[in-house]
């Protein structure tokens, strides 16, 4: 299927470009938008680090340093107690949802913070393992599910 074509392309492309390997994130439990471990293991990926239910898998092409999660991602916490969303534009719907949530928060006088991850440095220093969308409330990571106004309202009530 398409997954096989994509992973084989990624592996070949990375090797052709002289990369050290490829990493991906999986979960011990089935979660939305996260690949299945068995699929990647079939291509030689191995677990190299863990945070809670999440595992970092790597397919290394050489003997370079084994990838690890950054220390700041291990806590999955932030100092801010307001609802805070870290996001990037990996998904084409993200900006739409950010705009919808911004409008909803204004209309309902709710404090919500958006922190856009738009550089490698910001991604490396993110307070969790997700850099495409991460929801924090009262300082704690609560999910990586992209929210719209309706799902946000259910979460905060």
Annotate each PLM feature.
Residues 25-26, 37, 41-58, 142:
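Conserved catalytic-core motifs of GNAT/GCN5-like acyltransferases
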Residues 110-122:
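Thiol-based oxidoreductase modules, predominantly thioredoxin-like and allied folds used
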Residues 14-32:
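Conserved GNAT acetyl-CoA-binding A-motif
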Residues 73-107:
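Local sequence-structure signature of Cys/Sec-based thiol-disulfide redox active-site neighborhoods
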Residues 52-74:
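C-terminal "cap" of GNAT-fold acetyltransferases
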Residues 1-14:
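Conserved acetyl-CoA-binding loop-helix of GNAT-fold acetyltransferases
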């Amino acid at each position: 299927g398409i997954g096989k074509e994509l992973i084989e392309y990624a592996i070949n492309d990375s090797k052709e470009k002289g990369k050290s390997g490829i990493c991906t994130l999986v979960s011990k439990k089935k979660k939305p938008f996260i690949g299945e471990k068995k699929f990647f293991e079939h291509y030689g990926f191995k677990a190299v680090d863990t945070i809670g239910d999440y595992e970092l898998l790597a397919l290394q092409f050489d003997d370079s340093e084994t990838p690890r999660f950054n220390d700041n991602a291990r806590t999955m916490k932030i100092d801010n107690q307001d609802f805070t969303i870290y996001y990037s534009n990996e998904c084409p719907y993200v900006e739409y949802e950010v705009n919808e949530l911004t409008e909803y928060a204004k209309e309902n006088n709710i404090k919500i913070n958006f922190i856009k991850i738009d550089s490698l440095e910001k991604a490396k220093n993110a307070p969790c393992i997700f850099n495409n969308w991460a929801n924090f409330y009262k300082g704690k990571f609560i999910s990586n599910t992209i929210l719209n106004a309706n799902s946000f309202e259910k979460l905060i009530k």
